Every structure is written in structure tokens, then in C-alpha cells.
């Protein structure tokens, strides 16, 4: 029997599972109860400006056409159905026909008024809490290492998103370079990621493997520090 994915990888500790393939084909195959919440940043259709579309900054500013064409597409299919998985955060949710939300998440990029790109990005949620804002300049993404994907979010932003979600098992069906997965590993959450493009799937897999190894290396030192502090307090 054929599988709906090109590749599947599960971490040795069993907390991370990644799929390379179309999320619309893979999602129905996930085991019931395996996903508690969705945190994702799907592609949304600004259009190929170089091809006569109405595209804006994403397809024409700083990003070569050869790179942008792989992700600057029409609105991703299936986003409207993601809320059925429970708690849900969708970046770019203002581009989709989603239900009214009490709690929008705002990424304030701290950009001046004379910049041509947007000063904020919005995430739709189905959370029952007030609007929240995260302030971090987009240029600070460089502090986290190389920019690996055209629409890559800061790990700190995705960790902040997870702060508002109580669920333990997180799904990102539009995984990109794996930033949501890295954030989940850092916070001890389970993660399922799906990415259509093999190039970005490979990048995400490597990043998440590196983060798992980093956390595994730090755990013994953290336990030793906790043990020392406990002994001192006794």
C-alpha cells in the first residue's frame, strides 16, 4: 500500500515526527488524538508580481524570483479546517476566511513608518483571551543564525506563541524550515511537522535534529545544577 508522503522521520525519543508531502493527503492518516493544537505559518497568495500578479514585498523585495516561486502561491488549501484540531494559531490568518477571533496575535517588527514593508504580521487564533503583541525587529532574526526560508519566523516568536497554548502535541502542516519544531523541542512539547518542498523538509529535519542534540547535551548539566542547588539549600 502506497503512503501519502515521500519521507517520514521520527526522532529517537519519539517526540518529533516529520513528513515530506502534501498536508491535505497526510492529515487524514494521522492517528486520532495525536494532535492537540496547530501552530503554523501557511503560504498566502500575494501573487507573483514578476508574472503580472498583484504581489507585494514577498515576491519582489530582497527575494529573487527563483527562490520565491516555490512558496509565493495562491492561498494554501485546507487552512480553514485546521481549527478542528483544537487550539489553533495561524500566521497570516487575515488572508483566510476564518471565523471571528477574540484573540489575534500581533508581531510588531518595530519598523519605521517610511519602510515599504508591513510593520506588523497578524496571527488568527481560536483562543479565548485578549489580543497579545510580540515586539521584535525582523533584523534580529540574524541573531538566531542564517535565514533559511523566505518567510522564516524567529524561534523566539514561535516560543511566545506556544506560551498561549496549553496543549502538549503541536502540529505544523506548513512546516517550512522547521522553526515551530525547534520551539517545541526547546519547550518540551511533542511536534508533528509536514512540509511539501523536499528542500525545506531537509532543512527542517536538520535544524530539529540539531536542537534535539543540543537539548540532550544540556539536560545532564541542568540536572547537575539542580542537584547542586538542592544540596546547598539543605
Question: Where is each model-derived feature located?
Answer:
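Class I S-adenosyl-L-methionine-dependent methyltransferase catalytic core
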Residues: 1-171, 179-234
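Conserved glycine-centered beta->alpha loop in an early N-terminal alpha/beta scaffold
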Residues: 174
Amino acid at each position: 500500500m502506497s503512503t501519502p508522503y515521500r519521507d517520514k522521520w521520527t526522532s529517537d525519543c519519539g517526540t518529533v515526527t516529520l513528513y515530506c508531502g502534501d498536508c491535505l493527503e497526510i492529515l487524514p492518516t494521522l492517528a486520532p488524538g495525536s494532535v492537540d493544537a496547530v501552530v503554523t505559518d501557511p503560504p498566502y497568495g500575494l501573487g507573483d508580481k514578476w508574472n503580472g500578479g498583484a504581489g507585494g514585498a514577498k515576491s519582489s523585495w530582497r527575494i529573487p524570483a527563483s527562490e520565491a516561486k516555490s512558496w509565493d502561491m495562491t492561498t494554501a488549501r485546507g487552512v480553514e479546517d485546521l481549527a478542528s484540531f483544537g487550539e489553533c494559531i495561524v500566521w497570516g490568518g487575515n488572508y483566510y476566511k476564518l471565523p471571528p477571533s477574540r484573540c489575534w496575535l500581533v508581531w510588531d517588527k518595530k519598523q519605521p513608518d517610511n519602510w515599504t514593508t508591513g510593520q506588523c504580521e497578524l496571527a488568527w487564533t481560536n483562543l479565548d483571551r485578549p489580543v497579545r503583541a510580540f515586539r521584535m525587529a525582523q533584523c534580529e532574526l540574524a541573531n538566531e543564525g542564517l535565514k533559511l526560508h523566505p518567510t522564516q519566523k524567529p524561534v523566539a516568536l514561535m516560543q511566545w506563541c506556544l506560551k498561549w497554548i496549553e496543549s502538549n502535541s503541536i502540529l505544523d502542516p506548513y512546516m517550512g524550515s522547521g522553526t515551530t519544531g525547534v520551539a517545541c523541542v526547546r519547550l518540551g512539547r511533542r511536534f508533528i511537522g509536514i512540509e511539501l518542498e523536499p528542500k525545506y523538509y531537509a532543512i527542517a529535519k536538520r535544524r530539529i535534529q540539531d536542537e534535539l542534540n543540543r537539548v540532550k547535551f544540556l539536560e545532564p548539566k541542568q540536572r547537575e545544577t539542580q542537584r547542586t542547588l538542592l544540596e546547598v539549600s539543605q
